[in-house]
Amino acid sequence: MHAAVAPIVEILTLNNGFYAKAFEKLDDEMARTQFAPDTSSITWLLAHLATSRVQIGELMGLEQEMPWDGVFAHGIAEITHDRIPILSDIKNVWGDISEAIMKRLPELEAGDLSVEPTSRFPTSENTALAALAFLTQHEVYHLGQLSYIRRLLKEPGLFKLLFLR
């Protein structure tokens, strides 16, 4: 494994655990709760993170179709309930791409990490490694949001679910 990827693997592994716990004790109706207009629900955040994982896979040369027509790729969008996926579908997309990513990460070499990504990310260098670091941090940000929303729903936060049981 390339040395630059090792800390990213650690964070993505931790994120996998947090993401799995985000589904605990939630049904589809509860997960769609929005606490104010133009705010994210748990369902929206989970789908956004699954879409982001597909982007991470793309950075590594993995090919998977962008789920849900890319509706969850950027920023909260006005979507009707009939277009919002159910939790089990979101979990499956995350699981499939995450499994492929975790297998691919140890295979990455310096040349793979220095490739210019097809999308631009808010990083000082325009490389796959910088984009991978950004998207990993992006996951952590949204996992924090998920944890907070779970607590608003009177459910335990993600840290408590993963480490304090």
Please name every model-derived segment.
Residues L12, N16-Y19, F23, W94, ...:
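Hydrophobic alpha-helical core bundles mediating ligand binding, dimerization, or RNAP-core interactions
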Residues E78-T118, L129-Q137:
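Acidic/histidine-rich alpha-helical segments that form the ligand environment
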Residues K25, H48-T51, D96:
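Residues within well-ordered alpha-helical secondary structure of globular protein domains
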Residues K25-R32, K103-V115, R151-P156:
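Surface-exposed helix-capping loop/turn segments at secondary-structure junctions
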Residues V9-T13, A20, M30-I76, T118-R165:
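Short, contiguous alpha-helical
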Residues M1-A6, R165:
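Basic/polar N-terminal segments that are highly enriched at the extreme N-terminus
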